[in-house]
Regions:
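N-terminal, leucine/charged-rich tether regions that mediate assembly and partner docking
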Residues: 1-122
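Intrinsic-disorder/low-complexity, polar/charged segments
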Residues: 42, 169-173, 194, 224
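Extended assembly-interface/linker segments at domain junctions
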Residues: 93-190
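Short, hydrophobic/aromatic alpha-helical segments in well-folded domains
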Residues: 95, 215-218, 234
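Short, charge/polar-rich alpha-helical segments
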Residues: 188-203
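Non-transmembrane amphipathic alpha-helical segments
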Residues: 201, 205-222
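Short, charged, amphipathic alpha-helical segments
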Residues: 225-235
Length: 235
């Protein structure tokens, strides 16, 4: 078999994806101009491509024929796209949003960087690391009521050492696979059941934690009993 296209040290095979889904190295590299050369693109988006992205590559194409899963009208195929970003850079959310908006099927983004802060295994606090790192990201539709304007959102997982980063083909249909890949990215869980409800619950919890932290800080800054009581009421 031809050498598989890679992003840093990661390719379809090291990620654990089917060999048949791997894109050959000769066909993997994608020029940035491919994504910003058509239609109206803001100067800010062009700048993001220039500064936030070092290279783009197609790592794998997941289809019924390459996964053994049943077809799905919504997801005839799912692309696995590698984005190499500068050392220490964040997941390029704006670039991901722009690329994913150009097609209807799902895309899993494999973001790779050569070093940056990683959470300490014991304390969870960020510590500097020069190891190659990976973070997965997806752009997913947010459930809305019928007739309402569609909403999408980019979700990214945490940075982790690239060695050992895996994506698992799971489910019986391509749509179930997409839900599973989203769950693997967002919840670090292979089971994509009720993933939208789980995303909503997680975001609600994050919001409440943020509001509690703000109220706690306001309570600490309060100089009068009235101010402290007002802040306490929000906690």
């Amino acid at each position: 078999m031809a050498i598989a296209a890679s992003c840093g040290s990661l390719n379809a095979l090291t990620l654990g994806l089917p060999t048949r889904a791997a894109v050959p190295d000769a066909k993997g590299a994608l020029p940035k101009q491919m994504f910003i050369g058509r239609g109206a693109v803001s100067a800010k988006t062009k700048q993001r491509f220039a500064t936030d992205i070092e290279s783009i590559g197609m790592l794998a194409i997941l289809r019924p024929a390459t996964t053994g899963l049943a077809e799905s009208r919504r997801f005839p195929e799912i692309l696995v796209l590698g984005l190499h970003v500068p050392s220490g850079a964040a997941v390029p959310v704006e670039v991901i949003d722009h690329i994913a908006a150009q097609r209807q099927g799902g895309i899993v983004f494999v973001c790779v960087r050569d070093g940056g802060p990683l959470p300490d295994a014991e304390t969870g606090e960020p510590i500097a690391s020069d190891a190659e790192q990976c973070a997965f990201a997806v752009r997913r539709n947010v459930p809305v009521k019928p007739g309402h304007t569609p909403i999408t959102k980019v979700h990214a997982g945490a940075w982790r050492p690239a060695a050992g980063s895996r994506l698992t083909v799971y489910g019986t249909t391509m749509e179930e696979l997409w839900d599973s890949l989203c769950a693997q990215t967002i919840a670090d869980d292979i089971d994509g059941t009720d993933i939208d409800a789980r995303i909503a619950a997680r975001e609600r919890a994050t919001f409440l934690e943020s509001e509690y932290a703000k109220a706690k800080a306001a309570h600490a800054r309060a100089r009068t009993t009235e101010q402290r009581n007002a802040a306490y009421g929000k906690m």
